[in-house]
Amino acid sequence: MNQNADFCINNVNIATMRSTKQTENDPYGIRENACIFIKNGLIDAIEPAKRRLSSTIKTFDAQRKWLLPGLIDCHTHLVFAGNRALEFEMRQQGMSYAQIAQRGGGIRSTVNATRLASYEGLLNSAIGRAARLVEEGVTTIEIKSGYGLDLATELRMLQVAKDIESYLLVNIQPTYLGAHSVPFEFHEDPDAYVDFVCEHVMPEVIKQGIATSVDVFCESIAFSPVQCEKVFRSAKHYGLNIKAHVEQLSDLKGARLAAKFNALSVDHIEYLPPDDVPAIAKSNTVAVLLPGAFYHLRETQRPPLTALRRHHVPIALASDLNPGSSPVASLLTIMNMGCILFGMTPAEALSGVTRNAAQALGLAQKGQISSGFDADMCLWDIQHPNELSYGINQIRPTRVWVNGKER
């Protein structure tokens, strides 16, 4: 028994999601009737349940509820102004996402609204969106910029993202997504905008320390592989991690390019050819699937799940919460969509929002319940962990801890 723990949770069933404990018969890494000890914000030890515990240790009796790692939403765009409900109506009338973007809608319409928004306005709306994720047991959220596309607004977005931590007990991981769309002022010279991203904004992001990763949108309506490679080289120069939106609408070999630069993740990948999957596996890059966008855009091309499984590529799931293609502020719903729309198992879906989502963000101490890991945990009143993927808007965690602190 650990006498020096800050607190313990006794009589608890645990889905550790540890890769070393997972088997074909037990993909959740289950420890039943256990006692977990927390010290200094970390998981200190997991032992069999205790009949008696020291009176000096603060103890929670879980009554055989289930303890799971805190959920991780590893791909969001939740800092923005305005909405795109009109574009949703246009799509329902037959116009495609690409056609709307070519007419100046899409990302550019959100850019116009976001540039006009104040810091306070952006912060208040972002807190509301993040709070909806948090109430479902999300303890870490990645948030991208990309709706400013100028120096001042991009920096403001990243600062807003980080400042959410002052209002909600949640870990925020800001990502600089300058190469999201070509802004109007550069529409005649997209290469000059890429230079602006690499030579003017990225150094300031580093100087202010408000992002640890860089993302790009490699697509025919956004940036070419050549342009994305320039962003990647600049990111490597500044010591930033790489993530990439690739193969969402077409196959430009963006995933192969990202893997060449050892990207943390390649996201969307509906049009990823199975023959390109080995390159992702070799670079240990996570495949982040975004069924919310697939659903909202009524796409039909599914990610190559069979090939990803065959080559043991880690698969994550994320909300892609954004105003245009995935206005979905529910990671639990995304888990269900991953199963129903993409054919994932409930265990794969849970791995996708815990262990694999942590890997997609380069967070080696999150996403699993194991000694030495951050004490990001949720207690659920369920019969089995597969219930998280089973229903829609039915359950919420009864208790949540972030870095050992209870919400």
From Swiss-Prot:
N-formimidoyl-L-glutamate binds at residues 147, 322, 324. 4-imidazolone-5-propanoate binds at residues 84, 147, 180, 248, 325. Zn(2+) binds at residues 75, 77, 245, 320. Keywords: Cytoplasm, Histidine metabolism, Hydrolase, Iron, Metal-binding, Zinc. GO terms for biological process: L-histidine catabolic process to glutamate and formamide; L-histidine catabolic process to glutamate and formate. Gene3D superfamilies: Metal-dependent hydrolases (3.20.20.140), Urease, subunit C, domain 1 (2.30.40.10). The keyword tRNA processing does not apply. It catalyses: 4-imidazolone-5-propanoate + H2O = N-formimidoyl-L-glutamate. Pathway: Amino-acid degradation; L-histidine degradation into L-glutamate; N-formimidoyl-L-glutamate from L-histidine: step 3/3. InterPro entries: Amidohydro-rel, HutI, Metal-dep_hydrolase_composite, Metal_Hydrolase. It is found in: Cytoplasm. Binds 1 zinc or iron ion per subunit. GO terms for cellular component: cytoplasm. Catalyzes the hydrolytic cleavage of the carbon-nitrogen bond in imidazolone-5-propanoate to yield N-formimidoyl-L-glutamate. It is the third step in the universal histidine degradation pathway. PANTHER family: IMIDAZOLONEPROPIONASE (PTHR42752), IMIDAZOLONEPROPIONASE-RELATED (PTHR42752:SF1). This is Imidazolonepropionase.
